[in-house]
Curated annotation (Swiss-Prot):
SUPFAM superfamilies: Glutathione synthetase ATP-binding domain-like, Succinyl-CoA synthetase domains. Succinyl-CoA synthetase functions in the citric acid cycle (TCA), coupling the hydrolysis of succinyl-CoA to the synthesis of either ATP or GTP and thus represents the only step of substrate-level phosphorylation in the TCA. The beta subunit provides nucleotide specificity of the enzyme and binds the substrate succinate, while the binding sites for coenzyme A and phosphate are found in the alpha subunit. Heterotetramer of two alpha and two beta subunits. It comes from the Bacteria. Coiled coil: none annotated. Its EC number is 6.2.1.5. Substrate binds at N264, G321, I322, M323. PROSITE patterns: ATP_GRASP, SUCCINYL_COA_LIG_3. It comes from Bdellovibrio bacteriovorus (strain ATCC 15356 / DSM 50701 / NCIMB 9529 / HD100). This is Succinate--CoA ligase [ADP-forming] subunit beta. One of its GO terms (cellular component) is cytosol. Residues 9-244 form the ATP-grasp domain. Binds 1 Mg(2+) ion per subunit. GO terms for biological process: succinyl-CoA metabolic process; tricarboxylic acid cycle.
Amino acid sequence: MNIHEYQAKEVLRKFGVATLKGKLAHSPEEAVAAAKEIGGSVWVVKAQIHAGGRGKGGGVKVAKSLDEVSEFTKKMIGMTLVTHQTGPEGKVVQKVFIEQGCNIAKEYYVACLIDRATGRAAMMASSEGGMDIEEVAEHNPDAIKKVDIDPTVGLMPFQARELAFQIGMEPAIVNKAVKFFAGLYNAFVATDCSIAEINPLVVTKEGDVLCLDAKMNFDSNSLFRHPDIVEMRDLNEEEPSEIEASKFDLAFIKLDGNIGCLVNGAGLAMATLDIIKLHGAEPANFLDVGGGANKEKVTEAFKIILKDKNVKGILVNIFGGIMKCDIIAEGVIAASKELGLKVPLVVRLEGTNVELGKKMLKESGLNITPADNLTDAAKKIVAAIKG
């Protein structure tokens, strides 16, 4: 689950991470009032969407007067902001964050994340803050430094100091950086983050170490432990079909292709997406029905897939372990009848009760194309949508 920048800063402040004064606004009038309350003579108007790269897209503006605060807010509210993370369709800006300006001397990058290679948390930092870290990794990988964190003791002060020196921080601010890094790590662990990213962390000309922008993503499996975090969820920033899928415990991610996929198991689902692309087509979604799906769940999955007007065909790929093939077949038949399915449907079944499942599909009288294996399934659905 993602949250907005202003919410991430609220969370981080609780753990001692220093931020600038800021206030949320939904209109030019609120923005001006916020700027007056914050004080000073320079403010930053920031569009609040669940995506990075806002500055390049025109979603971050420095205002040097209250009139400019009003002007920039008026332009941002309601605009469709397109960044490298939103895709070409962009996201509509519904609110802005008015933040105090500061005298930036140097920008850095720092993040806590899970290192899949070690199975531990890690802290990454770079002297090249304010840039997309993916670009830094590609063009100057040596600029990124990393420390692995032992979960039994957490981030040790010597590790934080070492990281600060590795990215070129001045000795005079290292102690402040150590406190900052510790707060970031503590927030990461306490709230069950999958990533907590500060980009940029800035050192001001006055020698302060501050969080200028923040991104936090939380493990959705842990949200039952964090009702305060759940309250921060902004459904307006999420794909409606993904919200609907979550109500039925379906793991669903909308994609840009035209072949709908219904699969059990995340690994098999990813392999299914890959083989569709291998055969020259594009998947419309990732959908894992899980191991305990029933007829009703399969029907809801079909409904969600078919709400996407780009879907020209559906591939069902099931390996029956806990999930029995006859249960899937029953769900496929029920969904096809209830929805009056008009797009090609290819079904590949393997595993528990596979023969019974295939028999049910064959005797259903519906236009369902069986497939013997994954390659056969991909070839058949691609051929079907291409006519």
